[in-house]
Amino acid sequence: MNGMKRYNQPVDIIIQQTTAKPGAKGIAYAGAAKTIEKQLEAAGIPVHSVRRAAVISSASSKSKQKTAIPENAYTKTKINDTEVNPWDVAHIARTALNNPHTFVEPDFLQEFTINRKVNPEAGKTDAKSFGNRNNDINYDKDWPPHQNTVWHLDDAYSQLKSARELVQDNDALIRIAHLDTGYSATHFIVPGSVKKNKLQRNFVDGEPVNDAHDPLKDGFLKMPGHGTGTLGILAGNKINLHTDNGQFNDYLGGAWFAEVICCRIASSVVLLKTSALAEALNYVTQLTISGTPVHVLSLSMGGAPSAAWAKAVNAAYNAGITIIAAAGNNFNGLPTRHVIYPARFGRVVAACGATCNMEPYFTLKPGEMQGCFGPKRHMKKALAAFTPNIPWASTAGNNIRFDGAGTSCATPQIAAAAAIYYKKYFDQLNKLQPWQRVEAVRHALYTSAKKTVEHAPLSYQQYFGNGILQANDALEIPVTTGITKTPEDHAPWFPILSTIFKNKNPQSVPVLQMYNTELAQLVYSYPELSKLIDDENRSYDKIGVRKWKQFKEAVVAHPDTSVTLKKFLVKM
């Protein structure tokens, strides 16, 4: 999950611009792209293209929401990322644009950890998180349950089957945005309504914008089919399947009744472009405030902190969209054992993993993929669902496997539960302010969650946050309005910047925000830096001066720190 790795490709940047006065021009006006290109070229940055995100015209006059959608300009340069640090390009661009309200960040390719290990029986490389095993044993023998069954829907686990049956006669239309690698055009698990939905979008460069299907192309750093697997768990078709404990003849999807809007944000779950996720989040928010409300968003990917992601999450929250995002995966704590972004943001539900025996999705066995969790101070908005060894729609054989794994599998279970709750309390929720709907849904899921953990040295909060999903019990929690609005999300603030820059509100200064975002990405990407500030287990404002001094020196010496940030820190 290294968010700063370079791939010998041109540097892309995301330009965000606020305005000094109401009514002043930002970057959304006609001709802005050309102006940006000229300014960057004049500063010595060769530009390939500048593009502003498309704006959706209002589909309904009924919408009275005033949620502000972030104004972003996505710029492709001709500078190679191995020649110049992308953050240095971002700083040069900010200076060239000559606007104190401009924020620029690199449009990094984010790595999302999945599992590749040798399958002893087949002697082949295995992407376990996709359920692509090539032998007669469908489940992963390293984890329970040790049989091929559809178990996660049952009352002893997520309770999704009972919960959805309770609301099946309710005719309220629930929409779920599904952000992933798209869907298979041929797999039987994908509902026809998903394939026909005209609201589907593709945010992968060079692919048709209105077609979110996954062409399932193999190749270097490509892992096709991930979106089909998560979609099956979220809203998959009815299937008739022989299992070790009998015949399963029911819907695989926890929220099969929902209208699903697929957004293809990556050609592979292994690599995710920062801008693609930001654009997809903003697209879903635009739909909502334009009269086509999206109630829940399921995201089984993520990476390093990004300002564009934070702003997109804030806009979605204010529009009333409940976001469920994967907490991430790791191998024995690498690249990080802690929850990734955007799942770590306070306005997002972080989907962690719990095994079928209520144990943490954690192991000390070498080379074994497991789920991210913690630090505890960032688990207040987290929730766990079941993984691994749950049914997975595999595109390799166009079938159902029983070794679905990773927090990618937990995410759609929680999203389905959120959709079920919204379906039951549709009228009551719609009477609330949009952000209150998010808080009411989350309150029900958190309050009803099972507060337990088995065979673990720490409390359930450490691994599961608010507990383990209990979808049917959540329906017993009435809609509440007495919850405080969650503060706006942003990259964690580094106090050393406040001491360097004497300003009444340093966090509002774009250039400092840029330094701060780079620091956050460095800490996220490099464990040796994270360890210097207590591996993020303590709040930054409680870390002593000596440790901050050591941290600053290490950042200045680090090869992946931008020259601009190094110079700034040295001046301290």
Can you annotate each of these PLM segments?
Residues A53-T67, P120-Q147, F203-F220, Q286-I289, ...:
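Surface-exposed intrinsically disordered loops and tails
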Residues D180, I340-K423:
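Extracellular S/T/G-rich loop segment that most often corresponds to the catalytic His/Ser-adjacent loop
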Residues N237, C262-R347, M358, T395-P412:
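Substrate-binding/access-modulating region of protease and related hydrolase catalytic domains
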Residues A122-V260, A276-V294, A557-D560, T564-L565:
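Active-site core segment of subtilase-fold serine proteases
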Residues V294-M301, A307, K423-K571:
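C-terminal subdomain of the subtilisin-like protease fold in secreted/lumenal serine endopeptidases
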Residues N2-N8, I15, K21-G23, A30-W151, ...:
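Autoinhibitory propeptides
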Residues L231-L234, K238-I239, I261-S267, P293-L297, ...:
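Hydrolase catalytic cores
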Residues I14, E105, R175-H178, G232, ...:
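Structural recognition of the beta-strand scaffold that forms the well-ordered cores
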